[in-house]
Regions:
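Polyanion-binding surfaces on beta-sheet-dominated domains and ring/shell assemblies
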Residues: 1-161
Length: 161
């Protein structure tokens, strides 16, 4: 979907770093300019809009699934994602703010997202490994497959007054 370039300015340096990392590993182009009244709201809102952007990008014929495990020094984090339209998040990350970012992202990307911290002492390393793993898993999940990966078919509803 892009080249992995990012222009990010949220006023929150670690969030900026995570978004640049996500863009690079996912191969997505991100341009994020954001400010918030509270740090919590800012991080949540950015998760919401990045998730919504990913939902808009996901083709009906996407592979849908991505699964990556990333080591970063003391940290080892596994991420599995399905961009098939069923929002669900299973964590947690050791940082409540970035755990909430992942939940907000998953809800608005309409993705099932599992983030499993296998080990790690340094919260920075754990969160960064999670964003790297998410990026690589997204790159795989958003790839074009040429077919719709679903056995459910479709349903339609007609409502008359």
């Amino acid at each position: 979907p892009g080249t992995g370039s990012a222009r990010v300015d949220t006023g929150e340096p670690f969030l900026d770093h995570m978004l640049v990392t996500l863009a690079r590993y996912a191969g997505l182009d991100l341009d994020v300019q954001a400010r918030g009244d509270l740090r919590h709201h800012l991080i949540e809102d950015v998760g919401i809009v990045v998730g919504a952007a990913v939902a808009a990008l996901a083709p009906a014929t996407a592979v849908r699934y991505g699964d990556r495990t990333i080591p970063m020094d003391d940290a080892l984090v596994h991420v599995s994602i399905d961009v098939g339209g069923r929002p669900y998040y299973e964590g947690p990350l050791p940082s409540g703010l970035y755990d909430h970012w992942m939940r907000s992202f998953a809800d608005h990307a309409r993705a099932t997202l599992h983030v499993r911290v296998i080990r790690g002492r340094d919260r920075h390393h754990v969160v960064e490994a999670a964003f790297k793993a998410l990026g690589l898993a997204l790159r795989d999940a958003l790839a074009e497959s040429g077919a719709v990966f679903s056995t459910k078919g479709s349903a339609s509803v007609r409502v008359e007054p």
